[in-house]
């Protein structure tokens, strides 16, 4: 059985890792041993932050809805309760978008909520 030389496969593996490390600063971007560790750590951060992103955006939407609702005389929790009572099924992402870009539409939703809360 012939001896296996690793020239081609090693070069391909190194190229793959260094391509993933493109744009990294210093030796993290051009020394294989360090780049390999940096790429692995970057993958861990990416995995973790794909999950964190969902929580962060939800917090942002709630903060925006709360700010817009308070301008119109309701707290976020009162507003959320009123939405449920008025059976308005608009998600937080859409409500936050309305609160930022279409104040009139958000205001009309708040009026419906206030009417249900008063009743």
From Swiss-Prot:
SUPFAM superfamilies: Ribosomal protein L20. CDD domains: Ribosomal_L20. GO terms for molecular function: rRNA binding; structural constituent of ribosome. One of its GO terms (cellular component) is ribosome. GO terms for biological process: ribosomal large subunit assembly; translation. Coiled coil: none annotated. Belongs to the bacterial ribosomal protein bL20 family. Binds directly to 23S ribosomal RNA and is necessary for the in vitro assembly process of the 50S ribosomal subunit. It is not involved in the protein synthesizing functions of that subunit. This is Large ribosomal subunit protein bL20. It comes from Acidovorax ebreus (strain TPSY). The gene is rplT.
């Amino acid at each position: 059985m012939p001896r296996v030389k690793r020239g081609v496969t090693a070069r391909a593996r190194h190229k793959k890792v260094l391509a993933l490390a493109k744009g990294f600063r210093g030796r993290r971007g051009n020394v294989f041993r360090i780049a390999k560790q940096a790429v692995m750590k970057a993958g861990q951060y990416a995995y973790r932050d794909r999950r964190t992103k969902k929580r962060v955006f939800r917090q942002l939407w709630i903060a925006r809805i709360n700010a817009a609702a308070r301008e119109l005389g309701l707290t976020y929790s009162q507003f959320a309760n009123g939405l449920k009572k008025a059976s308005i099924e608009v998600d937080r992402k859409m409500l936050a978008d309305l609160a930022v870009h279409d104040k009139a539409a958000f205001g009309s939703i708040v009026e419906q909520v206030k009417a249900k809360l008063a009743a």
